[in-house]
């Protein structure tokens, strides 16, 4: 059975559908079954969207393994997100869209989001994605290199424990160069590792504690890696 992807598009996607079609057609060429939903009755309400994904998972002949939300949580082209209520912080996240069976927190599908505000942003995201997959940079073994960041100073030792577990999984899947950042100057170490090219990057901690900012993201330059 072919792998299946469900794209969730903003209800006002309009003439931008042609831009998204570039990505969807590429995925079909790769062998995926591709479906999309943009009905306002579904995509404008988080609960309705969750029910739609759950129904697809339970009843479709080829249910989605991957669900991609195309749009910001807020903005000109938006897909709503969820707000958790058990921490007291009302944290945002799309994970509930992936928990489709049972009363646990384990996902049944892979969930992701392509956030954009303008047509230009969307075109850039899709162009980079298609080029990355169709013409990967093979100049060095960067795709077997990983960086795991555990911000333990304030966030707690679980950040390191989580990354140590991830490191073991990566080693079992052939990763040869796994860097860990558990102390020191987090922004400079993260920027340095990202700029060298990584096949996998994970940050475990509370946002802002490490000192890594939007400006730091912009300063990373890893070319096609």
Placement of each model-derived feature along the sequence:
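Cysteine-dependent hydrolase recognition
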Residues: 1-225
